[in-house]
Amino acid sequence: MVLTIEALKHLWRLDESRVGRSEPLPLDNRHYVKGHPLCDAFTGLAQIQFGLGCFWGAERLFWQLPGVFSTAAGYAGGGVPYPTYREVCSGETGHAEVVLVVYDHTVISFEQLLQTFWESHDPTQGMRQGNDIGTQYRSVIHCTTSKQYAAASTSREVYQQQLNTAGYTAITTEILHPAPPFYYAENEHQQYLAKHPNGYCGLGGTGVTCPIRLQV
């Protein structure tokens, strides 16, 4: 069964009187690795949100890809505006840890991003990734276009067949369009593993190849 926000609502208690705020958290608007803006209109570039566990390792995974212009760690999919890391980790906001990926589709295809996403985590684990347990670690793809949504949905079906053959259970990845609001994480979480090369990275794939050929 594919998890949706509606199916997840009973797992958390949204209380905007206790958490969240009306203004964004302070942000240094410069990518620590690439030197590009973290927050911008990004005219002429495409955007997508991926959640595949702890955003520290996930963000590094994508900023290393040729054609990716910028990345940012953040929170999305919940009901509380401008949350903090502590609030998200409480499980009361409904948000997932996600990475905003800004890319040049003439250099890297959406297909390549999807392959990286599927092959870099275990999308069958529900509310966890490895030792990281909680609703914030669920697997998500938040699409900014209907074309992305169609491609992501098709890729999930294709990868499910591969996982079935390898003995895995059902994919629990939530795919949404339009993408919910993206809230930037605190400065200390941005490009964390570039600032702390020996820091924690909990990413771990299944070892199953995703053979999609969508050319999106």
From Swiss-Prot:
Catalytic residues, per the record, are C54
- Which InterPro entries does the record match to this protein? Met_Sox_Rdtase_MsrA_dom (IPR002569), Met_Sox_Rdtase_MsrA_sf (IPR036509), MsrA_MetSO_reductase (IPR050162)
One annotated GO biological process: protein modification process
The keyword Oxidoreductase is annotated on this UniProt entry? yes
Enzyme Commission code(s) on record: 1.8.4.11
Known catalytic reactions = L-methionyl-[protein] + [thioredoxin]-disulfide + H2O = L-methionyl-(S)-S-oxide-[protein] + [thioredoxin]-dithiol; [thioredoxin]-disulfide + L-methionine + H2O = L-methionine (S)-S-oxide + [thioredoxin]-dithiol
| Molecular function as annotated in GO | L-methionine-(S)-S-oxide reductase activity; peptide-methionine (S)-S-oxide reductase activity
Q: What class of enzyme is it?
A: oxidoreductase
Q: Per UniProt, which keywords does this protein have?
A: Oxidoreductase
- Provide GO CC annotations from the record: cytoplasm
- Is Protein biosynthesis among the key words of this record? no
Function, as annotated, reads:
Has an important function as a repair enzyme for proteins that have been inactivated by oxidation. Catalyzes the reversible oxidation-reduction of methionine sulfoxide in proteins to methionine.
Family (UniProt): Belongs to the MsrA Met sulfoxide reductase family.
Protein name (record): Peptide methionine sulfoxide reductase MsrA
Source species of the chain:
Xylella fastidiosa (strain 9a5c)
